[in-house]
């Protein structure tokens, strides 16, 4: 009986480990979007005033927060060394407000680094075709605590005025939820 329980426990653990390995391999690759149109240039899209509408869903898919964002965006500098400022004002459905100011730096190779007060270290991103992918760690306030959570953030240009954004939030590799946004350029 003990041997059967031990084997059952080992089998269950092996299946769980295998499932984790498979899900770890099933990620998007920015290169997959290289031929997609319209071609995204962050400097052009995030320039001027934008409105965004979004939801945060928990890991079960339930909407737990709705919000809007007003963004004022600008770029300065010479080609290959541009610096962008994305000034975001969030308003949540419960009436709370939040501000985040991204400072972006574009490299000659087309990659980006970004900083914001609530981002731990730097965000790294790259664009290909109609897509942009960011990876970063965010200090997320929940009640009276702040948690460091990781974001795998993907944006897809749909038209010259509309971009969709889907970001997966995780901690210790465990998915906590997703943020889905629609940006509209004025």
Per-range role (PLM):
Residues 19-22:
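Bacterial Sec-type N-terminal signal peptides, specifically the leucine/valine-rich hydrophobic h-region
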Residues 152-186:
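Glycine-rich, aromatic-bearing surface loops/beta-hairpins
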Residues 63-70, 146-151, 175-177:
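Amphipathic hydrophobic-ligand
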